[in-house]
Amino acid sequence: MNGIGARRIGLLGGTFNPVHNGHLRAALEVAEFMALDELRLIPSARPPHRDAPQASAEQRLAMVRLAVADEPRLTVDDRELQRDKPSYTVDTLESVRAELAADDQLFLLLGWDAFCGLPSWHRWQELLDHCHLLVLQRPDADSEAPEALRDLLAARSVSDPLSLAGPGGQISFIWQTPLAISATQIRHLLATGRSARFLLPDAVLAYIQAHDLYRAPNA
């Protein structure tokens, strides 16, 4: 059982290069379905698994802040941008958990591909010491978890995400509305002079245009 007054906090990390409506819709759906007190978007500074982003950390942070400005359930956490070393999720979880009460619930949101890649993450076996994992699945997803995760799923998975109990330690899957939007797609549109409107918030698009981001080098 959860303690009376225990908070429910969600975390969604990413490069957000740029943040788009796919990120935002997934975050809002989870915040509503799970009755979270807060869902924090956490921009990564130097993601260990990706090349350096095209926009600066400060620009990506500014875009995320603009994107969630009118949605009180979504907030921005910039702690990973304060680091001068690669952003490891386990470090972020430890840092957030240290700020919460012992019975507060912490939920880490992961896409299916990220979840399947967990065995390559730094100290990945420790993630559940700090949080529950909420794996976002699209209705059209049809794949199995890698063998390295099957024992973990057998021991820790819960069929109903609303029944996740305690501050952490379990895994559940949650359906999300399939929005075929990607940051790569948006960057390509902008680099080729085409419109990205309705794929991301107008305020974010205005910021991109004002700062001349994602333009082709010879544009």
Curated annotation (Swiss-Prot):
Function: Catalyzes the reversible adenylation of nicotinate mononucleotide (NaMN) to nicotinic acid adenine dinucleotide (NaAD).
Assigned EC number: 2.7.7.18
UniProt name for this protein: Probable nicotinate-nucleotide adenylyltransferase
Protein family per UniProt: Belongs to the NadD family.
Pathway: Cofactor biosynthesis; NAD(+) biosynthesis; deamido-NAD(+) from nicotinate D-ribonucleotide: step 1/1
Top-level EC class as recorded in UniProt: transferase
Taxonomic placement: Bacteria, Pseudomonadati, Pseudomonadota, Gammaproteobacteria, Pseudomonadales
Keywords: ATP-binding, NAD, Nucleotide-binding, Nucleotidyltransferase, Pyridine nucleotide biosynthesis, Transferase
Species of origin: Ectopseudomonas mendocina (strain ymp) (Pseudomonas mendocina)
SUPFAM superfamilies in the cross-refs: Nucleotidylyl transferase
Gene Ontology BP term (one): NAD biosynthetic process
